[in-house]
Amino acid sequence: MQEKIPDLKQFRKESNRHVLVLEAQVSEQDKYKLIHLSNNVLRTAGNDLTGVMKKNYDQLVRTKRYRHLQSLYGKAKKAKRDKELKAVGAEMKQMQEEYHVTWEFCRQSMIRINKQYHLNSIFALTQAEDVWKGVEACLYREGKTLHFRKYGDH
């Protein structure tokens, strides 16, 4: 059993969710409630959080200092200067904390938003993880902006 634990940890690290498929007999009214929850309530709560994080991210990127740090980081990465890379990375991380573009702020914001929508905490945390993945794409990869979910999108 102990030898399978590292494999399980690696699997959990690589996959963001576990899906369990069950067959159930559900009444039409319960089906309507489930669809309403997934399409409307979860989407609007996620869009509220996306709006908060988008505002903070846009304010961060708008600063000259952060854009300058991004260019320095790119130059240091190309030249493979690890010391400079760490210093610039630490300064960028500190600015992200100042402008509240962190996973912890995203999670705490979703907790506040969840008080309005009364979602199950697992659903709320899942929405926060989805939004944070978008923020990470903008911060650390080639993402340009955060996008809201439209009605009917999955």
Map each language-model feature to its residues.
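Nucleic-acid substrate recognition interfaces
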Residues: M1-H154
